[in-house]
């Protein structure tokens, strides 16, 4: 029970890596604000069962990361609970794959809006609240695409590169409040997006990885638990 009596916020936790982090944190005793874009019957049932099994509180918070006002609304909902926030995991994001010369500007802007700008906005609001407690941990889910230039990943990779750089800068600023800020950069991971990838592209990514296999969501979740 590494997170017993702690409260975490996890964004984009209805599937894939985010869902694995939600389950791992709940299994380790954390109460969770589970932030997703919209309510679905399946997600509501999943968190009800998980909460019942683990005995922790899981509070859904619904907002669209593209809409600035909704992001502010999500922050307000969480802060109004008056709970101390110990951990924030920024996992919400979208994938995008297209060659540089074929990438329209609106696509690039949309990817950055969700993968970068909304993450910054959310971190600003939550970190101000964390600062009052003089403690906390922020974990950003980035990607190896933000570290290694790969054909067809200009939009996605550059948004994750920006998030990685921001993580370093924010860490240097929030350290005085005893808030740690880290990023995890997984390689290709077995999620629904992985299943939708072109087989040739998927195999190329697997071949470039050290273990010659996709990463499992729970492996990323365990790293997030360590950093929490």
Task: Set out the residue ranges of the language-model regions.
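Conserved glycine-rich cofactor-binding loop
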Residues: 7, 14-15
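Conserved glycine-rich Rossmann-like NAD(P)H-binding loop of the short-chain dehydrogenase/reductase
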Residues: 28-45
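Substrate-binding pocket helix/loop in short-chain dehydrogenase/reductase
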Residues: 99-100, 107-112, 194, 205
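C-terminal helical subdomain
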Residues: 183, 205-228
């Amino acid at each position: 029970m590494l997170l017993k009596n702690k409260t975490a916020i996890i964004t984009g936790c209805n599937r894939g890596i985010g869902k694995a982090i939600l389950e791992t944190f709940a299994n380790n005793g954390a109460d969770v604000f589970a932030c997703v874009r919209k309510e679905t019957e399946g997600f509501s049932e999943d968190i009800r069962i998980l909460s019942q099994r683990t005995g922790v509180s899981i509070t859904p918070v619904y907002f669209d990361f593209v809409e600035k006002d909704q992001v502010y609304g999500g922050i307000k909902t969480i802060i109004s609970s008056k709970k101390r926030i110990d951990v924030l995991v920024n996992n919400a994001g979208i994938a995008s794959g297209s060659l540089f010369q074929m990438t329209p500007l609106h696509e690039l802007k949309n990817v950055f809006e969700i993968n970068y700008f909304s993450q910054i906005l959310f971190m600003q609001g939550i970190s101000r609240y964390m600062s009052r407690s003089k403690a906390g941990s922020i974990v950003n889910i980035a990607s190896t695409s933000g570290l290694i230039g790969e054909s067809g990943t200009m939009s996605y990779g550059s948004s994750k590169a920006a998030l990685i750089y921001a993580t370093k800068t924010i860490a240097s600023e929030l350290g005085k409040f005893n808030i740690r800020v880290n990023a995890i950069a997984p390689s290709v991971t077995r999620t629904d997006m992985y299943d939708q990838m072109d087989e040739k592209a998927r195999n190329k990514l697997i071949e470039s990885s050290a273990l010659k296999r996709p990463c499992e969501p729970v492996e990323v979740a365990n790293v997030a638990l360590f950093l929490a």
